[in-house]
C-alpha cells in the first residue's frame, strides 16, 4: 500500500557538557542542522521533552513571564499556554495534551530526543467510520489477555493462553475459560500474539491448536528478539507464522485491517495492536509501558489494556536491608495505586468510547507460592473502571469469561441491555483447581539430567550466555521448593567482570547479588537455554543484593538478550565422556 515501516529518528543530540549545563525548569534548544526547535523540562533527575510547536496553529513557544513557578511556556501566535511539567495546555484549559518525545541517554552520556517516524501511522490512508449492524462486531473475553473478535465474517484472536502455567510454574489462570475455547481458536482466521512472555505465547495452548490447525495464520511484530525464537525447541508444529513490520496497515479484507506497533521507540520485545473494521478502531495496548513511543490514537471505539500490576518478582522475592514485610506491603500498595491512576489518566486523555481492563487475571495458585499469592496484591478492575467513570464519560467493561460485547449496539446506545451479553447463569467464572502435575513433571525431569553430573556445566552455560565485562559478582544457590539449599545442589560464584568462577568473593570492591533458585526451574532454564523471566517474573527465586542497586544490563541480558539457540549440551557431554568420568570434570566444547 506504499507505506513505510516505522523507524526511530534522533531529533536532537546534546553533548555531556550540554547535559551538565541543563538548568532546573525550562530549557530551549534548536537543532542547528534541521532548524527545528525543542523544549526540555528538568525536575531534579526527571526530564521531559517536546517539540517547540503549539498544537493550535504551529506557533513557537517562549518563556511565560507570568509563570513564577517556571513550568509554562506561551505561544507567540495566540498566547496559548503549555505546562511543560505535565505536557497539558492550561490556556485554554482541557484543550490538548502536547505530544511528548522520548528522552534517552546513550552509552557516551549524550542525551537524545527520539521519535518514531511516522509518529502516527494509523492516520495514513484514513477511513471514515461506517454504521455497524447489530452483531456485526462482537468481542468475547476468554481469559487473561485472550479475546475472540468477530469482525464481519472474519474472526481474530488475541494472545491465547488457555491452559497450563506461565513463567515456569509461577502463574496460573484466574478465570475458567469457556468450555468451547479450543473450537473458537480453530475457527479463527488469524491470531495476534503480542510478545514472547508465556502468558501471551502459551506453548501448551498452541500445542493443542497445532494438533488441529497447524497452518492457522499467526501474526507477530518484527521485534529484535523474535516472538517465536524458541519454536523449534518447543516441539509445536506451526507452519504459518507471519512477522510483520511496525506501523503498516495489514489488509485482511476490504473492511478489516490491523497495524502492529512497538513498545517505546526500540522494537525489543513488546508490541501492541490497532484493529480497524469499517473505520472503527480497536486499540489493544497489552503489556506495553509506552506504546508507540507514547503516541496513540484518540477516540477509538474500544480500548483494552493491562491494569493489575504484580507481573514482577520485585519486591516480593527480595530480602535483607530495607526489604521488610512492612516495606514491601507499603511499596506494593503505592505502586498499584500509581498504576491505577496512570491508567485512568491515559484513558481520560485518549477518550475511547469504551474501555476494558484485561491481561491481569492470573494467580499464584501452587501451594508452594502461598506467600507470593498473599503478598502480591493486584489492582481491582472495577476500582479502575469506577475511577475512569468519575473523571470522564468513557463506558467501561469488566469482562467475565464468555461475556460478549456487541460493538455496534454499544456505540449506538450504551444502555442497550443486549450491548453486553453475560455468560449464562451458573457459568464457572473462577478456577478452583489446576492440573499442576504434568507441567511440574516436565520441570522435574531436568533435575536429574546428565548435564548436571559435571560441574563444568556452570562454565559452559555462562560462557554460552555471553554476559561479561561488568563489575558484578553473583552467588547462585540451588534450592528446594521452600528455598532451602537443595541436598547435593550447586552453590557457586560467578564474577562477570572476567567471567570467572572463584571459590571466594574477590578482594576488589564489587556489587554482589545472591540468587536462590528452585532447582527444577533453574535446571530446566539452563538445559533449554530459556530466558530468566521464567525465574524472575515467575517468582522462582529469592534475592539479596549489596548494595541495593538494580543492575539493568545484567538482568536485561538474561531476560531478553540470551542467544537464540540453546547450549550444545550434546557436544558438551561428548567432551566430558572423552575426558573421563568424574563429577568435577572440567570440559569445554569447541
Curated annotation (Swiss-Prot):
MF terms (GO), sorted A to Z: 2 iron, 2 sulfur cluster binding; CMP-N-acetylneuraminate monooxygenase activity; metal ion binding
GO CC terms: cytoplasm
Source superkingdom: Eukaryota
InterPro entries (UniProt xref): CMP-Neu5Ac_hydroxylase_Rieske (IPR037339), Cnh (IPR027033), RibonucZ/Hydroxyglut_hydro (IPR036866), Rieske_2Fe-2S (IPR017941), Rieske_2Fe-2S_sf (IPR036922)
Pathway: Amino-sugar metabolism; N-acetylneuraminate metabolism
Similarity section: Belongs to the CMP-Neu5Ac hydroxylase family.
CDD domains linked: Rieske_CMP_Neu5Ac_hydrolase_N
Compartments where found: Cytoplasm
Cofactor details (free text): Binds 1 [2Fe-2S] cluster per subunit.
Provenance organism: Pan troglodytes (Chimpanzee)
A Pfam short name: Lactamase_B_3
Function: Sialic acids are components of carbohydrate chains of glycoconjugates and are involved in cell-cell recognition and cell-pathogen interactions. Catalyzes the conversion of CMP-N-acetylneuraminic acid (CMP-Neu5Ac) into its hydroxylated derivative CMP-N-glycolylneuraminic acid (CMP-Neu5Gc), a sialic acid abundantly expressed at the surface of many cells.
GO biological process, one term: N-acetylneuraminate metabolic process
Cofactor(s) needed by this chain: [2Fe-2S] cluster
Protein's name in the database: Cytidine monophosphate-N-acetylneuraminic acid hydroxylase
Domain Rieske per the UniProt entry, residue ranges: 14-112
Entry keyword Iron-sulfur: yes
SUPFAM superfamilies named in the record: ISP domain, Metallo-hydrolase/oxidoreductase
Iron listed as a keyword: yes
PROSITE patterns per the UniProt record, alphabetical: RIESKE
Gene coding for it: CMAH
Catalytic reaction(s) noted: CMP-N-acetyl-beta-neuraminate + 2 Fe(II)-[cytochrome b5] + O2 + 2 H(+) = CMP-N-glycoloyl-beta-neuraminate + 2 Fe(III)-[cytochrome b5] + H2O
Amino acid at each position: 500500500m506504499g507505506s513505510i515501516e516505522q523507524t526511530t529518528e534522533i531529533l536532537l543530540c546534546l553533548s555531556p557538557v550540554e547535559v551538565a549545563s541543563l538548568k532546573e525548569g525550562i530549557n530551549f534548544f534548536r537543532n542547528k542542522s534541521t532548524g527545528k526547535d525543542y523544549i526540555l523540562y528538568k525536575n531534579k533527575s526527571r526530564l521531559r521533552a517536546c517539540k517547540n510547536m503549539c498544537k493550535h496553529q504551529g506557533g513557537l513557544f517562549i518563556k511565560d513571564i507570568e509563570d513564577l513557578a517556571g513550568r509554562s511556556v506561551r505561544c507567540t501566535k495566540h498566547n496559548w499556554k503549555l505546562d511543560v511539567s505535565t505536557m497539558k495546555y492550561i490556556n485554554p484549559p482541557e484543550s490538548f495534551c502536547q505530544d511528548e518525545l522520548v528522552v534517552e541517554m546513550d552509552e557516551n552520556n549524550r542525551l537524545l530526543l527520539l521519535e518514531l517516524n511516522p509518529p502516527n501511522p494509523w492516520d495514513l490512508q484514513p477511513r471514515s467510520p461506517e454504521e455497524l449492524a447489530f452483531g456485526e462486531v462482537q468481542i468475547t473475553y476468554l481469559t487473561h489477555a485472550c479475546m475472540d473478535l468477530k469482525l464481519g465474517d472474519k474472526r481474530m484472536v488475541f494472545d491465547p493462553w488457555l491452559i497450563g502455567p506461565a513463567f515456569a510454574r509461577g502463574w496460573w489462570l484466574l478465570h475458567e475459560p469457556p468450555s468451547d475455547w479450543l473450537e473458537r481458536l480453530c475457527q479463527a482466521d488469524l491470531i495476534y500474539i503480542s510478545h514472547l512472555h508465556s502468558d501471551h505465547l502459551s506453548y501448551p495452548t498452541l500445542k493443542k491448536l497445532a494438533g488441529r490447525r497447524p497452518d492457522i495464520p499467526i501474526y507477530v511484530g518484527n521485534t529484535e528478539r523474535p516472538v517465536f525464537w524458541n519454536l523449534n525447541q518447543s516441539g509445536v508444529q506451526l507452519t504459518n507464522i507471519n512477522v510483520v513490520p511496525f506501523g503498516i496497515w495489514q489488509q485482511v479484507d476490504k473492511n478489516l485491517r490491523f497495524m502492529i506497533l512497538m513498545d517505546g521507540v526500540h522494537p525489543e520485545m513488546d508490541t501492541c495492536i490497532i484493529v480497524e473494521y469499517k473505520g472503527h478502531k480497536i486499540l489493544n495496548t497489552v503489556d506495553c509501558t509506552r506504546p508507540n513511543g507514547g503516541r496513540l490514537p484518540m477516540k477509538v471505539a474500544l480500548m483494552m489494556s493491562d491494569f493489575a500490576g504484580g507481573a514482577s518478582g520485585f519486591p516480593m522475592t527480595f530480602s535483607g536491608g530495607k526489604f521488610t514485610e512492612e516495606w514491601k506491603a507499603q511499596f506494593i500498595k503505592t505502586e498499584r495505586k500509581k498504576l491505577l491512576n496512570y491508567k485512568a489518566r491515559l484513558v481520560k486523555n485518549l477518550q475511547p468510547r469504551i474501555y476494558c481492563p484485561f491481561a491481569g487475571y492470573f494467580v499464584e495458585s501452587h501451594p508452594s507460592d502461598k506467600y507470593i499469592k498473599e503478598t502480591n496484591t493486584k489492582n481491582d478492575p472495577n476500582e479502575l473502571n469506577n475511577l475512569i467513570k468519575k473523571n470522564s464519560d468513557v463506558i467501561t467493561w469488566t469482562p467475565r469469561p464468555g461475556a460478549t460485547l456487541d460493538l455496534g449496539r454499544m456505540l449506538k446506545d450504551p444502555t442497550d441491555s443486549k450491548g453486553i451479553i453475560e455468560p449464562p447463569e451458573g457459568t464457572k467464572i473462577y478456577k478452583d483447581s489446576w492440573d499442576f502435575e504434568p507441567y511440574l513433571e516436565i520441570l522435574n525431569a531436568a533435575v536429574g539430567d546428565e548435564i548436571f553430573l559435571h560441574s563444568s556445566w556452570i562454565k559452559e552455560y555462562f560462557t554460552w550466555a555471553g554476559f561479561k565485562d561488568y563489575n558484578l559478582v553473583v552467588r547462585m544457590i540451588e534450592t528446594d521448593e521452600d528455598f532451602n539449599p537443595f541436598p547435593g545442589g550447586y552453590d557457586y560464584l560467578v564474577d562477570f567482570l572476567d567471567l570467572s568462577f572463584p571459590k571466594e568473593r574477590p578482594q576488589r570492591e564489587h556489587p554482589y547479588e545472591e540468587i536462590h533458585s528452585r532447582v527444577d526451574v533453574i535446571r530446566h532454564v539452563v538445559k533449554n537455554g530459556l530466558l530468566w523471566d521464567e525465574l524472575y517474573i515467575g517468582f522462582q527465586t529469592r534475592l539479596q543484593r549489596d548494595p541495593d542497586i538494580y543492575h539493568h544490563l545484567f538482568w536485561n541480558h538474561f531476560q531478553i538478550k540470551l542467544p537464540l539457540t540453546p547450549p550444545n549440551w550434546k557436544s558438551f557431554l561428548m567432551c566430558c565422556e572423552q575426558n573421563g568420568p568424574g563429577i568435577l570434570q572440567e570440559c569445554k566444547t569447541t
